[in-house]
From Swiss-Prot:
This is Translation initiation factor IF-1. One of its GO terms (cellular component) is cytosol. Belongs to the IF-1 family. Keywords: Cytoplasm, Initiation factor, Protein biosynthesis, RNA-binding, rRNA-binding. NCBIfam families: infA. InterPro entries: NA-bd_OB-fold, RNA-binding_domain_S1_IF1, TIF_IF1. GO terms for molecular function: ribosome binding; rRNA binding; translation initiation factor activity. It holds the Pfam family eIF-1a. Component of the 30S ribosomal translation pre-initiation complex which assembles on the 30S ribosome in the order IF-2 and IF-3, IF-1 and N-formylmethionyl-tRNA(fMet); mRNA recruitment can occur at any time during PIC assembly. One of the essential components for the initiation of protein synthesis. Stabilizes the binding of IF-2 and IF-3 on the 30S subunit to which N-formylmethionyl-tRNA(fMet) subsequently binds. Helps modulate mRNA selection, yielding the 30S pre-initiation complex (PIC). Upon addition of the 50S ribosomal subunit IF-1, IF-2 and IF-3 are released leaving the mature 70S translation initiation complex. It comes from the Bacteria. It comes from Agrobacterium fabrum (strain C58 / ATCC 33970). It is found in: Cytoplasm. Residues 1-72 form the S1-like domain.
Length: 72
């Protein structure tokens, strides 16, 4: 998938789910299920409930996403 096809939205992690997945509430009030990106796992960046994150989504499935950045 090319970079132009990816949609990015900021959101807040509301709930931790099993298997390193999270429920994220986006700024447009939608709730999605997201997992951490590989680079975040590799660098051991922790994501906790209440963290502000950047979520990457594909236009084909707007219910799932990938957490690519955790804001400080």
């Amino acid at each position: 998938m090319t970079k132009e096809e990816v949609l990015e939205f900021p959101g807040i992690v509301t709930e931790l789910l099993p298997n390193a997945t999270f429920r994220v509430k986006l700024e447009n009030e939608h709730e999605i299920i997201a997992h951490t990106a590989g680079r975040m796992r590799k660098n051991r960046i922790r994501v906790l409930a209440g963290d502000k994150v950047l979520v990457e989504m594909t236009p084909y499935d707007l219910t799932k996403g990938r957490i690519t950045y955790r804001f400080k």
